[in-house]
């Protein structure tokens, strides 16, 4: 069953994403709106059959949605203790909005818009 960790400090939230990407997790969705990383942000990472979703707002900080076992591993690796609660950035409708506003990553990578592979 998936759980949602809430109120994660921005620096910790960003460092978890960076560490997972360095560990081989692949970005399968990313919010590319003009306010990405300023007001709101969304990332979806996958490795094998595992999936982790990250939501962030500058008002409510970071959120992470994943299986309990994955969240426990993240707590151990990053020496933190997550709080769990009602999400703001990772509500189903908000995620759908992020995904709708995002270009598929294969398009970005195919045309290499940012001069690097994402």
Roles of regions detected by a PLM:
Residues 1-3, 40-42, 61-63:
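A generic structural signal for beta-strand entry/edge sites
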Residues 28-53:
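Amphipathic, interaction-prone secondary-structure segments
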Residues 22-34, 80-85:
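Short secondary-structure junctions
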Residues 4, 72-118:
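Intrinsically disordered, low-complexity regulatory regions enriched in serine/threonine/proline
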Residues 1-18, 22:
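Terminal, regulation- and interaction-focused segments at domain boundaries
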Residues 5-8, 47, 64-68:
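Short beta-strand-to-loop capping motifs
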Residues 52-76:
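Intrinsically disordered, low-complexity regulatory segments enriched in Ser/Thr/Pro
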């Amino acid at each position: 069953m998936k759980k949602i960790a809430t109120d994660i400090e921005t620096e910790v939230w960003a460092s978890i994403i960076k560490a997972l990407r360095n560990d081989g997790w692949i970005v399968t969705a990313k919010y590319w709106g003009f306010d990405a990383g300023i007001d709101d942000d969304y990332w979806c990472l996958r490795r094998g059959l595992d999936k982790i979703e990250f939501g962030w707002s500058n008002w409510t900080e970071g959120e992470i949605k994943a299986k309990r076992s994955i969240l426990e591993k993240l707590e151990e690796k990053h020496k933190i203790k997550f709080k769990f609660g009602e999400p703001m950035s990772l509500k189903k409708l908000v995620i759908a909005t992020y995904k709708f506003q995002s270009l598929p990553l294969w398009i970005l990578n195919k045309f290499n818009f940012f001069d690097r592979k994402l």
